[in-house]
Amino acid sequence: MTEKRPFNLDATPIVFGFANALKKEMTEAEKFLWENLRNRKLNNLKFRRQHPIGKFILDFYCHEKMVAVEVDGRIHNTEEMRERDEGRTYMLAEWGIKVIRFTNEEVINELHAVLETIKSFAR
């Protein structure tokens, strides 16, 4: 028997509600990256935006390859947020999900490199 791969991991209706709200409030960098991921534009991979999984909401998620892409603003530079992000990444790794993090600036200024990195993680 094969192990069940996480898709939403029993995310609650509250988490789904937050995810839907976040779709309407994406940052400029998230919108920019989404335009390059949506509709299987990157290597024919299906990405979802603001995807709920367990108690988390992933900026972008490719279930087929178990890859999460997070776009971080400046708030993620604080010690508290770095620790929170590390814990979140650890938990997602326990579920078999690889997490890639980029800054808003990397997405806006180095999109080609960002997309190449995502492709390499999704092999």
Positions of PLM-derived features:
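Solvent-exposed, charged helical/coil patches
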Residues: 1-45, 123
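Basic, amphipathic alpha-helical patches used to engage nucleic acids or provide basic targeting signals
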Residues: 51-121
